[in-house]
Amino acid sequence: REHLGVFCRFFLFINLFKLPFSQSAGIITGLITQNVDRLHQRAGAQNVIDLHGRLDQVRCLSCGHTESRSHIQNWLEQHNTLPSLTSVTLRPDGDADLPAALIDDFQTPHCETCGGVLMPDVVFFGGTVPAERVQTCYRMIDEAEGLVVIGSSLSVYSGFRFCRYAIQQDKPLIILNVGQTRADELCLHKFDDDPFSTLSQYVAQLDSQTPERQHV
């Protein structure tokens, strides 16, 4: 997450384009994603809830005001002497050994509204998803005819809770994932297969026929 400039330029994984296609066909009415990269939106998906927040924003811990991450990056570069990546050795975790003077003199921005402390607008491990966002997800499930989980082990409760909620609302739960998931015993159908190949076959079938459509 320290390398936002590089991270934002990654090519979209082609599999992300399959979901917007299903949306345009009337199969999928909304997406709940645990990703923080906004790649679903860049692929053309609509009605997406970023469950764990957005890495392209920062948020004030005091007043909740948000700013773009690129704006903060520009501020950091204008107010600090940043070393070239070629002059330091990055560790596998993205950290590096820097001169003490550089660290001591480093300036950090504050909220432009109230002067508060800023943080990336994401839910880190141990953090809590905002209650309002969770309720929005519940409403999305209420309006759907079922829930499909794609490419997640559901080991984190923030996503698993929606599987439990769907079952409580008598909604069918379908899982597409390689390997075991936390909700295997709850789902109506489990496809232990690669999401890329499975979705590719599914989209090909949509091209050739008009299936009975359920909103998920």
Where are the regions that the model predicts?
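Conserved catalytic alpha/beta core of Sir2/sirtuin-type deacylases, generalized to analogous enzyme cores
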Residues: R1-V216
